From Swiss-Prot:
DNA-binding region, residue range(s): 8-67
Record keyword DNA-binding present: yes
Primary location class: nucleus
Protein name as catalogued: Homeobox protein H40
One GO cellular component term noted in the UniProt record for this chain: nucleus
Keyword entries, A-Z: Developmental protein, DNA-binding, Homeobox, Nucleus
Origin species: Apis mellifera
InterPro entries reported in the protein's UniProt record: HD, HD_metazoa, Homeobox_CS, Homeobox_NK-like, Homeodomain-like_sf, HTH_motif
Signal peptide feature range: none
Coiled-coil residue windows: none
Pfam families: Homeodomain (PF00046)
Length: 74
């Protein structure tokens, strides 16, 4: 789809170092968050639930690329 200049694009989220450390630490313990975990993490980091959800989606994709085959349930 061609980008329409009349549409406003959402600004890219710039996470702070502290937010990234907290997100990475949580990712080390679990790659999938429950709704409650996502809400609590978002509130504690002053982020929206959507920002946390998308960060985890992107991080899982990165993890799967770095660890091919490990995400398959055997």
């Amino acid at each position: 789809r061609r980008w329409d200049r009349r549409e406003a694009r959402r600004a890219r989220t710039a996470f702070t170092y502290e937010q990234l450390v907290a997100l990475e630490n949580k990712f080390k313990t679990t790659r999938y968050l429950s709704v409650c975990e996502r809400l609590n993490l978002a509130l504690s980091l002053s982020l929206t639930e959507t920002q946390v959800k998308i960060w985890f989606q992107n991080r899982r994709t990165k993890w799967k690329k770095q660890n091919p085959g490990l995400d398959v349930i055997s």
